[in-house]
Regions:
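Acidic, serine/threonine-rich low-complexity disordered tracts
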Residues: 30-101, 143-229
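Bacterial N-terminal signal peptides
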Residues: 13-24
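Sec/Tat signal peptide C-region and signal peptidase I cleavage site
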Residues: 24, 28-30
Length: 229
């Protein structure tokens, strides 16, 4: 005797649809990718910048391609950096992580092994400044002091940032926009010898421009501009 046909539950029919909707609801929306043009003298290249948010932290991934170079940092929403990684193939993959008033660096940097601890104080660690300076630009705070890692040497340096008001700036592709300006300098006696400037879009804090010199007198100025506004 042939078995009677199985009776199909209405739930079985809609189960795939329910699961699909559940996965769509759980998935985070794709983080927007911003493109920037960096120019130093006659040299220029484009890099990408992406901010991925999680529940109570912000993970900022900056992908910069001049050859093969990648920056990845894990920050609090207030801009403080908890961990950072810098990869430049084939000989650099270095990680930094904060533990109290110490930052441990490990990995390889330009072919040499790195395993060291640098002592700081209770000032925040900012990396990258294109994200970490955003609260200063938007919240009306006048100044802040912080630590940051020099990418070319892995040295931790103390810096000072000052809000410098708002102004309209030209964009590479698009109309003028209102931007909040932040000026950074080395903390202490060297503060009068070097400075750089950041601009953040007034409406949402997105980094839109940088201007500074990376070298001795006579070095061409470096300008970074948002391409996708």
């Amino acid at each position: 005797m042939n078995p009677s046909p199985a009776r199909h539950s209405p739930f079985q029919a809609i189960l795939p649809l329910c699961l699909a909707l559940l996965f769509m609801a759980a998935a985070s929306p794709a983080a927007p990718v911003f493109r920037y043009l960096e120019q130093t003298g006659t040299d220029s290249f484009i890099f990408t910048w992406r901010l991925e948010r999680e529940r109570d932290t912000a993970t900022l991934s900056v992908v910069q391609r001049q050859g093969s170079e990648t920056f990845l940092s894990r920050n609090t929403p207030a801009g403080d950096t908890l961990a950072w990684q810098y990869v430049h193939q084939p000989d650099t993959d270095v990680r930094a992580e904060r533990d109290g008033d110490r930052i441990r660096l490990s990995g390889r940097f330009r072919g040499r092994k790195v395993d060291e601890v640098q002592t700081i104080d209770d000032r925040p660690w900012f990396q990258p400044l294109s994200f970490s300076l955003r609260p200063l630009a938007l919240n009306g705070q006048a100044t802040t002091e912080f630590w940051t890692i020099r990418v070319d040497t892995l040295e931790l340096v103390a810096m000072r940032a000052e809000a410098a008001g708002r102004e309209e700036i030209h964009t590479v592709r698009g109309p003028r926009l209102a931007a909040a300006k932040v000026v950074i300098r080395p903390d202490g006696l060297l503060g009068g010898l070097w400075r750089a400037e950041y601009w953040f879009r007034a409406e949402d804090g997105q980094f839109v421009r940088y201007r500074g010199t990376h070298g001795p007198p006579g070095t061409p100025e470096t300008v970074i501009s948002l391409l996708d506004s």
